[in-house]
Amino acid sequence: MMFRKKRVKVNSRVAHSQRSLKKGDVLTLELPQDKDYGVDVEKGSITVLYEDAHTLVVNKDPFMLVHPTGQTKSCTLSNYVAGYYAKKGVVHKVRPVHRLDRDTSGCILFGKTKEAQQYYTDELQAGRIDRIYTGLVEGCIDSDGVVDAPIGIDPVFDNRRVIDEFGQPAQTEYTVLCHDGDH
């Protein structure tokens, strides 16, 4: 497709797919530029933890959605990331690589390009990116352990996940950091 759209050049000249490269040739690929953010742009406070030309990592506060859904179209992290891009004067479609539940806070990884988003998605699916959570539980867990069970959609609350023999494989290692009364 890039050849058809004349986005591949060798030595500043449009190249054809059969063209062989020689030592010293300069290959230039013109990647398509985003024309919009993909979500409504909103001003909002975000904390950028890391950023480079391909990647944006932002802290998600609790009680916020990562992206707009059927009923919630505004005040999401993605809307605020679009506002952040707009304030910087750049246009990147907002591409979250993963999500966190509404009530959960933590790092959200965004790809600034379709290629970066796909790369990080592939890395997550291959298990080469770790997700580490800190949580507070009610009751007393005596020792560290592993929950190795498939996760599926809760039949009662479709926005929750439960252990489900037909769900996706999942493994959670946990470490008890401390005990405090009933927690």
Give short role names for the model-derived ranges:
Residues 1-183:
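RNA pseudouridine synthases
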